[in-house]
């Protein structure tokens, strides 16, 4: 999977893996949706774990000057959507 990812996707996957996310999946929606090109879906063991995965992804994005457009659902930690824009 990794050989087909762009830099931003790889950053998100690596950040999630560093925080022990599991079931990481990249969905290519370029030919199916006008709303988005890709989804990354992953899982965590708890609300706190999910939040730490998101924190790691956001930290790496900010370090690489990729400011997320939106983050939804973070406070609950059950699900989180992060729009990385690119």
Tell where the protein language model's regions lie, with residue ranges:
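Polybasic/polar functional segments that serve as interface/processing modules
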Residues: 1-34, 47-80
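Short amphipathic alpha-helical segments
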Residues: 36-38
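Short hydrophobic/aromatic beta-strand micro-patches
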Residues: 41-44
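Active-site beta-strand termini and strand-to-loop segments that position acidic
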Residues: 82-84
């Amino acid at each position: 999977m990794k050989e087909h990812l762009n830099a931003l996707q790889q950053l998100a996957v690596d950040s999630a893996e560093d925080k022990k996310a599991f079931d990481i999946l990249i969905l290519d929606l370029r030919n199916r949706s006008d709303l988005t090109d890709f989804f990354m879906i992953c899982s965590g063991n708890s609300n706190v774990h999910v939040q730490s995965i998101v924190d790691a992804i956001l930290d790496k994005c900010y370090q690489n000057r990729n400011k997320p457009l939106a983050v939804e659902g973070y406070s609950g930690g059950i699900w989180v959507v992060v729009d990385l824009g690119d």
